Regions:
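N-terminal domain-onset segments
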Residues: 1-68
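Short, compact, well-ordered microdomains
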Residues: 67-111
Length: 111
């Protein structure tokens, strides 16, 4: 419960400080680094992303994340795993909460 309250408080603060942002990979990562891993970003569809460690949890109906030449489609509740490579290239992998649970045997915080 504490985690949920903390996340809600942090995302509210970021929402108020960020009236409009067009989503892209660089902005997502910058916000994550600048806000201690908790992030809420608005685009035309009011995207809400919460991060825990290196996982993005999509809190909106649908979002497309563009990363170099690839586009990743994610839906509500999906998790996006982020890998960082030495060359500074970022890669994203979309998976569902169930897939992540099965792979890592962990309980994912849900809305």
């Amino acid at each position: 419960m504490y985690l949920r309250k903390y996340i809600n408080k942090k995302t509210k603060e970021i929402f108020e400080a960020t009236p409009f942002l067009k989503i892209n990979e660089k902005q997502i990562l910058e916000y994550i680094y600048n806000n201690n891993g908790v992030c809420s970003i608005r685009d035309d569809n009011t995207l809400d992303i919460i991060t825990v460690e290196n996982k993005f949890i999509i809190k909106d109906e649908h979002v497309v994340i563009e990363e170099s030449e690839h586009k990743y489609h994610a839906n509500f509740g999906d998790i996006i795993l982020r890998n960082i490579y030495k060359e500074g290239v970022y890669a994203f992998k979309v998976c569902t909460q169930e897939e992540l649970r099965n792979e890592y045997s962990i309980k994912i915080w849900e809305k």
